[in-house]
Amino acid sequence: MRHKYSTRALVLARIPAGEESITASLLTEDFGLIRARSQGARKGSAKMSAGMQTLSESDVTLLRGKDIWRMAGAVLETNWARELDAAARKRAARVLELADRLIRGEHADPELFLILTSFLRALPERTEDEQDAAEMLAVLRMLHALGVDAGDTYGEPDDYSSGSEKSALARAIEDRSALIARINHGITESGL
């Protein structure tokens, strides 16, 4: 009998696999980025389908197979696609898509998970300019955590504060051009 692992996960992407199954790209708190197969997740009556939607934060139960992880359960914690307005949803999708492309291999990196979950939690409470700055900070911090940027990350991984001129978002708004240049350089260095 295989051991079951439970962890929190962000669903970065999902790809159809067969008639009713999916392979989900999950950024997990305990195992890093993994690909997991969910049998029957595309059925309308599937219990796990809500917890396996792109832009969902879920508590998942996983089984380690010979070649791939398998989903044994998924309980939806937050469906960010429903919580965010259209503009914020596009920002979140861009950041999670980039994370899916940049993060390689299975290794625990709680900082990456914290960066992205904090970013998602901050979006509904921010103005459009602050959301733009939060998107830049999330990408910059992700690049820093992956080792392709060594500059200032404008605070802690979960700091998307606003309100004062010294806040992370205010500083990012002020330094927008420099941040975009650093992000573009980091993406180039990553080899994408």
Positions of predicted regions on the chain:
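Non-catalytic alpha-helical scaffolds and adjoining flexible linkers that form interface surfaces
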Residues: 1-192
